[in-house]
């Protein structure tokens, strides 16, 4: 694995700017980019010179992997589904093959079911080829819940942006009081929430905590990801594209050769991602 910062390029202007500033338009110089969002893989085609020449979203890979199942979506890129509580039911996780092992992108929540699935995958997949790096696209517990367990098991580094890492650390430190106590009630009341709904909010956060959806404790150190940084993994260059809105400093990974963007929650094809 090789990491190198680069100067702004036309690719960054095309991909990064349009990713953040144009709703529904994701442009690639090759004019046909597959975008891997957190629920589906989809493709969109757009003429860079004529922005009216758009096509509806299509899904080149229709079959979603079952929970705990791994499928290959591109050379050296594998797609894994992990369970999460609630109606969304699953989170996408990615495995990137390197010369000396594997990288994991995002982790699933911190509960027994997900831990057991990872332990099975460790035995089946990573006995001879260990995990050499973990990337968390952003701070939310369905993406970071197993980060500490994975990094400690393989003694591998965690890669995140600074804004996501330290926000997660701050939330984890006061997770017990921020929503369920009087501070949380006062916050929601000032935001306009009816008094009779405050009790339901407290119950909801208590339930989420029991399901592993509270903010986990991250490893004590991390490797910082920055805009336009390039991670070379298994011969593929993955450029870091930073977004915001859904979370403070969300990291997407774009590989021009594979025409593949791992978008985390910055782009969602079904529900609305706050951007």
What is the predicted function of each stretch?
Residues 51, 73-80, 207-214, 234-236:
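Short Pro/Gly-enriched beta-strand edge/turn motifs at strand-loop
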């Amino acid at each position: 694995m090789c990491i190198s910062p680069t100067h702004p390029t036309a690719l960054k202007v095309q991909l990064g700017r349009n990713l953040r500033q144009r709703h529904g338009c994701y442009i690639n110089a090759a004019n046909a980019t597959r975008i891997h969002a957190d629920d589906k893989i989809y493709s969109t085609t757009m003429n860079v010179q004529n922005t009216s020449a758009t096509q509806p979203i299509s899904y080149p890979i229709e079959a979603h992997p079952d929970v705990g199942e791994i499928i290959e979506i591109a050379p050296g890129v594998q797609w894994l589904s992990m369970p999460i509580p609630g109606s969304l039911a699953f989170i996408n996780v990615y495995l990137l093959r390197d010369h000396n092992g594997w990288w994991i992108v995002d982790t699933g929540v911190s509960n027994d079911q997900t831990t057991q699935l990872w332990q099975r995958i460790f035995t089946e997949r990573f006995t001879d080829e260990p995990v050499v790096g973990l990337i968390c696209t952003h701070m939310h517990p369905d993406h970071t819940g197993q980060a500490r367990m994975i990094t400690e098991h393989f003694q591998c580094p965690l890669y995140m942006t600074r804004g996501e890492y330290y926000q997660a650390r701050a939330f984890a430190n006061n997770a017990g009081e921020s929503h369920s106590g009087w501070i949380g009630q006062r916050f929601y009341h000032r935001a306009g929430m009816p008094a009779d709904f405050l009790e339901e909010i407290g119950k909801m956060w208590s339930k989420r905590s029991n399901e592993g959806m509270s903010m986990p404790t991250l490893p004590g150190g991390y490797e910082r990801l920055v805009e336009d940084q390039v991670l070379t993994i298994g011969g593929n260059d993955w450029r870091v594209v930073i977004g915001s809105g859904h979370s403070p400093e969300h990291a997407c990974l774009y590989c021009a050769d594979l025409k593949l963007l791992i978008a985390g929650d910055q782009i969602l094809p079904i529900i609305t991602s706050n951007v």
